[in-house]
Amino acid sequence: DIQFTQDVLGKPFHFTSTWGIFSPEKLDEGSLMLLDYIEFKADDHSIDLGCGYGVLGMTAARECPNGQHLLIDKDFVAVEYAKLNCQKNHLNNAQVQLSNGFRDVEKDKKFSLVMSNLPAKASKEQHYLYLLDAYNAMESGARFYVVTINGLRDFMKRSFTEVFGNSDKLKQGKTYTITLAVKD
């Protein structure tokens, strides 16, 4: 196992990860950049789509103490480490679940905040399905924040606009773009 401590939004988190999970030795630039642009509300109920070892959902759980936070990933190894990291950091309002996209998420669950570091290697069809499923699982006024590699930014803008009717590019860096869509 790989252990490290890293500050997220000015406060430390303790992580355990392993080889074979995305960015095992330190938090990836894309996720850190995304977290700088998310507007957390104390009572948000969030979902971290493709959580890896957990940083987005863990941060939501800490920043939004009155809400419940679900972290999902289709990789069972990532899910085990995300569970461990939530326990280790005493995040009792976070739950981690194995799910390919929204497939195994309770149908009646509604979220006010969706966060994702979309994997560059998933297909565009896959991304589009995630957006449709997310839309259906979001309450009115909910926000969907995503970080993608710059090569996917036009695709994200088109897809968010088709599914949500809006798309707001919050930041474009050298490598990554942060995009937000809001459900009416």
Describe the predicted segments one by one:
Residues 128-140:
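A short glycine-rich, Lys/Arg-flanked "PGG" loop and its adjoining helix->strand segment in the class I
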